[in-house]
Amino acid sequence: MSATELKAVEEADEWRTAQAQFDEAAEIIRLEQWLREVLREVQREFTCHFPVKLDDGHTRIFTGYRVQHNINRGPAKGGIRYHPDVSLNEVKALAMWMTWKCAVVNIPFGGAKGGIIVNPRELSPNELEHMTRRFATEISILIGSDRDIPAPDVNTDGQTMAWIMDTLSMHIGYSVPASVTGKPLEIGGSAGRVEATGRGVTICSVAALEHLGRAPHQTKVAVQGFGNVGSISAKLLEEAGCTVVAVSEDYGGIYNPLGLSIKRVLEYRAREKTLKGFPGAQEIGNQELLTLECDLLVPAAIGNQLTSRNARDVKAKLIVEGANGPTTPEADAIFRERGIFLVPDILANAGGVTVSYFEWVQDLQSFFWSEHEVNQKLKAILSRAFNEVLKTREERKLDMRMAAYVQAVSRVAGATRERGLYP
């Protein structure tokens, strides 16, 4: 394997990235060796291979994972994703990132993640439901409202969560709405949950612009990824006064240096099921979007998009990570060297888990808040977290990512230290 090929393999390993980020934070805060050993590994990793009968009568074996990184600050929390590229290492990294994400915004959860190796577009609605319910049964020994609370992630949604919640409820004989979050409103979901991650990205973006002394109306934005997070981020950033010049989906995107009307883009995509052919815009590739002339770049698609191969070509002076792990350590080092201000994923996209926390609290109380209340509480928590990380950055002379990690790792280490080792 050539040096170039080896580097590409290294940069593609999210678990290596997650551990490297933790190691750096642990070194900065001089974390005790025993705590380093505890926190750099996951607490539980569960792999299952389970059969599902397809519509044509054949049986297919699926592979699924559920990983819990740390539960010393509370029940585990993390999404379930359906994707053909799901791997155990990816799920482990995402579980670790969830631990830090919950800690940096100071909500009482640990980190978890789950996934199934599948392209859900290849399954009928009936097959998708059967697969989901069987997976829920397999992981039912791990999940529950006081143990591990799943949520939607890549290619999963409120319907997926409804099936999981119903499956768990049928097993025990009564409804357990707090066992999952991101549910439809009719069965205990929270107002504002669908928009929460994108709203959090917007809150952090506006706070970062204010810190940098730049007004939203002076800001051109490029958003990679136009799913739930990307589309809502683009819409809310436009409402905040920014000019969105580019958006993209998995196959590519559209660009207009004078700005796109996100309302019209959303209407066009809903009608045509694609961004291709949107009038008044030129088609661009996903990688091309990352290096466009813009002030704010929001990578909101998948991991490992900003690497050593394109980091020097990024023209934005502000990056706000809507996706999980979109930047490799190699790219991070280049951005630090270039003085690019980056708001890390564990802070920038924590809006989703924060409102999931609100949903869990509302379910346990059977008392629900208005969307305005949810949004106000979300803004208060994320604004406080942003300012705490900014203060740590300035006091310790760090970048925002490492400041967020120092904040998060310190909190989790403190809880672990107080609880001690059993037995």
Q: Can you name each region flagged by the protein language model?
A:
Residues 93, 149-151, 174-180, 223, ...:
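General beta-strand structural signal in soluble alpha/beta enzymes
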